[in-house]
From Swiss-Prot:
One of its GO terms (biological process) is xenobiotic metabolic process. Keywords: Heme, Iron, Membrane, Metal-binding, Monooxygenase, Oxidoreductase, Transmembrane, Transmembrane helix. SUPFAM superfamilies: Cytochrome P450. It holds the Pfam family p450. The gene is cyp516A1. PROSITE patterns: CYTOCHROME_P450. It is a single-pass membrane protein. Gene3D superfamilies: Cytochrome P450. It is found in: Membrane. This is Probable cytochrome P450 516A1.
């Protein structure tokens, strides 16, 4: 009897939900269309595997603004550049906040930069933007990235001389982590597994936990059965936080002795907070969580883009040869390149942009929440809805990009390229656009540029590498091995 009653209640709620979400006419609001969702799971049966590709298929049926349900979370997916501008730029006061769930609250406690909202986020965003701006003017910072890119190139040498294959993705992760650690704390780790910094294992474990964490966010009831995963995430985050806390203490002690000795981003953070009119607003918890955010997000995004770029250059050896020739001309035959030569390498720059376009690591962006009803063309996005930018869908739009699924750097060199600014947003758009985007481009340019000057890369078996990838905390390549020849 109880089961029958529950079934009837679920059926009634399901019918009410269907009618509630149908588009309305007349004086009533019109909601974005979308596929029928099921009780409890929503549209997860359609989205669970490769959600960026699944949404792409649904988009062709329901349009560039559609509603889907991640379990019971109403989500509006936007795949149109004009609507993106309307929603995230023109109405940024309604769409700047993050959609927060269990995992994001554990990571940020609403006191970091990725997963905080309101005035708190605005204050830290301002400090971060000012610090990054001053960082770019600091000569020693550029030298740190350049030297790290040389060390990355040296890390490949053993594989070239021994004839052993190597998974470049793991070396790229070490490179991007070292760049962030150098810029943030003036620390670095060895590329040798035996000499690696203990924080590296903790960061890897956090990444693994986050993949399962998404499931716990959608179905909180599973926390009862997956307590170990949550505990594992917290324990590894504690290691990252402790490392950041120790570094903050170390930097403060140094600045007390010599306030003028600015070596890195953390020094700039501490100084900017002192100069801020809201200095009493910032506490140590916020500072160590912001620093930890940079370690977590800055490492994965740039390393994934480097892995994609090398993959496409291996699958297109003529492009790889052309890039190498251009780099050698720019350096006058030298085997190292710096940022001063960046303006001399238009084709290589185009390859970087094309990798960012064709495989954006933030394929579906970090979700926002509509803090009020939001207008999106003829539709209304209701208050409380989750909103996602379909970055991948924008990049695959055949009305904007000719042959969008083909890696073609020449599209960026064409004089008649006229796509909307919001058709290419690998670093997001609006008030939450990535403040470290220029830095990321520089680290990709130097890292890939210096290895291409020293080695020829081929796939392990001479066949093209799988270009599909997989969807995790970022859109990543499958692990692949390469052969390399020293030049």
């Amino acid at each position: 009897m109880i089961i029958l009653l529950l079934s009837i209640i679920i059926f009634i709620l399901y019918i009410v939900k269907i009618f509630k979400n149908k588009s309305c006419c007349g004086n009533e609001i019109i909601l974005p269309p979308g596929p029928i969702s099921l009780p409890f799971i929503g549209n997860l049966h359609q989205l669970a595997i490769d959600p960026h590709l699944a949404i792409q298929k649904l988009m062709f049926k329901y349009g560039n603004v559609m509603t889907v349900y991640f379990a019971n979370i109403k989500t509006v997916v936007i795949s149109d550049p004009n609507y993106l501008k309307e929603v995230f730029v023109n109405q940024s006061h309604k769409t700047s906040d993050r959609y927060l769930m269990g995992t994001s609250r554990i990571i940020g406690n609403e006191k970091d930069i990725l997963f905080s909202n309101g005035q708190y986020w605005k204050n830290y965003r301002q400090i971060l933007a000012q610090s990054f701006l001053k960082l770019r003017d600091h000569k020693g910072i550029t030298e740190k990235i350049s030297l790290e890119s040389v060390k990355l190139s040296q890390a490949f040498e053993w594989y070239a001389t021994s004839g052993q294959v190597v998974n470049p993705c793991s070396l790229f992760k070490m490179y991007t982590l070292n760049v962030i650690m150098q810029l943030l704390y003036s620390h670095r780790s060895s590329y040798d597994l035996k000499g690696q910094h203990p924080i590296i294992d903790a960061l890897k474990m956090v990444e693994e936990s986050l993949a399962v964490g998404n499931v716990l966010d959608l179905f909180p009831i599973l926390n009862i059965f997956l307590k170990k995963n949550k505990l594992k995430l917290v324990n590894n985050l504690q290691q990252v936080w402790s490392y950041s806390q120790d570094s903050i203490k170390e930097h403060r002690e140094k600045l007390l002795i010599n306030p003028e000795k600015i070596d890195d981003l953390l020094d700039l953070f501490i100084n900017e907070i002192k100069l801020s009119k809201n200095s009493e607003f910032f506490d140590d918890e916020g500072l160590y969580r912001v620093c930890s955010d940079l370690l977590l997000s800055g490492t994965e995004t740039s390393s994934s883009t480097m892995s994609w770029l090398l993959l496409f250059l291996i699958n297109n050896p003529n492009f790889q040869d052309k890039v190498r020739t251009e780099l050698l001309e720019a350096t006058g035959g030298k085997k190292t390149i710096g940022l001063t030569e960046k303006s001399k390498t238009p084709f290589f720059n185009a390859c970087i942009k094309e990798a960012l376009r064709i495989r954006p690591v933030g394929a579906l962006s970090l979700p926002r929440i509509a803090s009020e009803d939001v207008t999106c063309g003829p539709y209304t996005i209701e208050k409380g809805s989750q909103i996602i930018m379909n970055v991948y869908g924008l990049a695959m739009d055949p009305t904007v990009w000719e042959d969008p699924e083909t890696f073609n750097p020449y599209r960026w060199l064409s004089s008649d390229i006229s796509q909307s600014t919001y058709s290419f947003i690998p670093f997001g758009c609006g008030s939450r656009v990535c403040v470290g985007s220029s830095l990321a481009r520089d680290e990709i340019f130097l890292g890939i540029g210096n290895i291409l000057l020293n080695y020829i890369f081929e796939s392990q078996n001479g066949k093209p590498i799988n270009e599909k990838g997989h969807f995790g905390i970022a859109l990543q390549t499958v692990d692949y091995n390469v052969k390399l020849t020293k030049i």
